[in-house]
Design a protein with these regions (language model features):
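Active-site nucleotide/adenylate-binding loops and adjacent lid/helix of ATP-dependent enzymes
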Residues: 103-180, 190-193, 213-233
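A short glycine-rich, hydrophobically flanked beta-strand micro-motif that places a catalytic Asp/Glu
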Residues: 240-252
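Short, charged, surface-exposed secondary-structure boundary motifs
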Residues: 36-40, 54-57, 104-111, 149, ...
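ATP-binding N-terminal substructure of ATP-dependent carboxylate-amine bond-forming enzymes
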Residues: 1-98, 293
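Short glycine-rich anion-binding loops that position phosphate/pyrophosphate groups of nucleotides
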Residues: 77-79, 142-144, 263
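ATP-dependent carboxylate/phosphate-activation module, predominantly the ATP-grasp catalytic core
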Residues: 175-238, 250, 261-289, 296-298, ...
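Conserved protein kinase catalytic/activation segment
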Residues: 254-256
Length: 307
């Protein structure tokens, strides 16, 4: 099988590596001349995918290369690039392993929070109202991936210094700080046919956010079932077509969901493969055309992936 992977950053490294484990041939497309995933790909094409469909000779050459593969898998979170890819693939009849509707919700922390509230998902206490705000709190820009722009604020002065123009409900999420260990898990499939994968423990620090992943999890079976139920409920509400991950914290008061992302993650899929032999890239591809993923190992083994 031949796949096009668009984006050579962390997600691209993950996908190119897993593609090799699956025995796939990869075409990596990135606008940079030497992205991190470059040496993991079989073929590389430098291209700005927002220009697909244009008249440029080099762009048309890249289009021809992409059309020679079986499926396009995005490994980036640039809204303009994703929209351009979605439109171009639709026009060309090319399979695109992406759910734009689910991504539109999960790429916004405000829209995600609305979904959590509709689903009854346990989340950190909102802290937008000054009269009920208890520090420390977490400030998150609504748009953006992971921990980018997220700050732990200890008092009102720090909040005003970090958001000097005042709190804009359209641009920020303020919520109570929740201490405790962090966990992640993925779900993949189509409505009525989802599979939930191995829970992983996230190693966190102040400097690098997630600095490593451990599998299998050290959490209790009952806590794992609680995470799985929350993720399945969210996927069904979104009518997810593809792959989504969930990050939670186990607080003294119970589980608190931090975020969901309907895109291919980095770090955790490698840990899942090392522990179980299950390849999340294969399962993602199987959502879009007939493909039989490998069965994995009989029993999980210990894996610790640090970076």
């Amino acid at each position: 099988m031949r796949v096009t992977i668009v984006g050579g950053g962390l997600q691209g490294v993950e996908l190119c590596w897993l593609a090799r484990k699956a025995g796939w041939e990869t075409l990596l497309v990135d606008e940079r001349p030497a992205p991190p995933a470059l040496r993991l790909a079989d073929v590389f094409a430098q291209c700005d995918v927002t220009k697909l469909g244009g008249s440029g000779v080099l762009t048309r050459k890249v289009e021809h290369q992409i059309l020679g593969t079986d499926i396009v898998i995005p490994a980036l979170e640039n809204a303009a690039a994703l929209a351009a890819l979605d439109g171009w693939c639709a026009r060309e009849g090319m399979l695109f392993a992406f759910d734009p509707c689910a991504y539109e919700v999960t790429s916004s922390k405000l829209r995600s929070r609305d979904l959590f509230l509709r689903c009854g998902t346990p989340i950190p206490q909102p802290a937008a109202r000054a009269d009920t705000r208890v520090f420390p709190i977490i400030a998150k820009p609504s748009e953006g991936s992971g921990s980018r722009g997220v700050r732990l604020l200890s008092d009102e002065a720090e909040l005003r210094a970090y958001i000097p123009e005042g709190f804009d409900a359209e641009g920020w999420v303020l919520e109570s700080y929740c201490p405790g260990p962090s966990f992640s898990l993925e779900i993949c499939g189509t409505p009525g046919n989802y599979r939930i994968f191995q829970v992983t423990d996230l190693l966190m620090d102040e400097a690098f956010d997630c600095r490593g992943v451990v599998a299998p999890t050290g959490s209790s079976p009952s806590f794992v079932r609680e995470m799985e139920a929350a993720l399945l409920n969210l996927a069904e509400m979104l009518r997810l077509h593809g792959l989504m991950d969930l990050e939670v914290i186990q607080t003294p008061e119970g589980m608190r969901v931090l975020e969901i992302d309907a895109r291919f993650p980095s770090q955790t899929p490698t840990a899942v493969w090392l522990s179980t032999g299950v390849n999340l890239a294969e399962h993602l591809a199987a959502c879009f055309f007939p493909y039989a993923p490998g069965s994995g190992l009989g029993a999980p083994r210990f894996a610790r992936y640090e970076h």
